[in-house]
Amino acid sequence: MKSTFRPALVIFAMLTLICGVIYPYAITGIGKLVFPGQAEGSLVTQNGAAVGSSLIGQAFTSPQYFWGRPSATGPMPNNASASGGSNLGPTNPALLDAVKGRIDALKAADPGNTAAVPVDLVTASGSGLDPEISVAAAYYQMPRVARERKMAVEEVKAMIDRISQPQYMGFFGENRVNVLTLNLALDQR
């Protein structure tokens, strides 16, 4: 027993030092050196202060802002420490009720808008924290935002088109808009 205890303790201490201290600090240092913005959380700053992350959705509720996808994190929306989908199946009555409620809220915010509501405005992403919406979802909200900000719809559309990003590698996903970036651009205009 004594002959195996000392080597086991030494191996335990060495692996703890290597895997628990040296490796994490080395990878963090390399990450900060090679990808400084991403290693710090992809923070978006305005006037020297962090206003959000380009990777985590935020809950915009004012009608003068574009709204992102619903958050599936609970009990607080857009809580990065509680990331995950709702795990509700497509026939689950709770999901159907939530989607109907979100559709009703969108229609109440812009009663004159008769267009079909884009699916990404009423369903949460797999992480529950998606910072982006489809261009179609931005166009759907465009009349409300333009009216609330007393802007021409064409001006808001031009802003959406300028900020939108194409499909990843030309064919993955769809064209998308980062909601935080778009709302900050609206505030700076």
From Swiss-Prot:
Transmembrane regions: 10-30
Keywords noted in UniProt: ATP-binding, Cell inner membrane, Cell membrane, Ion transport, Membrane, Nucleotide-binding, Potassium, Potassium transport, Transmembrane, Transmembrane helix, Transport
An example Gene Ontology CC term for this record: plasma membrane
Entry GO MF terms: ATP binding; P-type potassium transmembrane transporter activity
Domain of life: Bacteria
Membrane topology: Single-pass membrane protein
Pfam families in alphabetical order: KdpC (PF02669)
Localization terms from the record: Cell inner membrane
Main localisation: membrane
InterPro entries: KdpC
HAMAP family xrefs: KdpC
Subunit annotation: The system is composed of three essential subunits: KdpA, KdpB and KdpC.
Protein family: Belongs to the KdpC family.
Record function comment: Part of the high-affinity ATP-driven potassium transport (or Kdp) system, which catalyzes the hydrolysis of ATP coupled with the electrogenic transport of potassium into the cytoplasm. This subunit acts as a catalytic chaperone that increases the ATP-binding affinity of the ATP-hydrolyzing subunit KdpB by the formation of a transient KdpB/KdpC/ATP ternary complex.
Name under which the protein is recorded: Potassium-transporting ATPase KdpC subunit
Organism: Janthinobacterium sp. (strain Marseille)
Lineage, highest ranks first: Bacteria, Pseudomonadati, Pseudomonadota, Betaproteobacteria, Burkholderiales
Protein's gene: kdpC
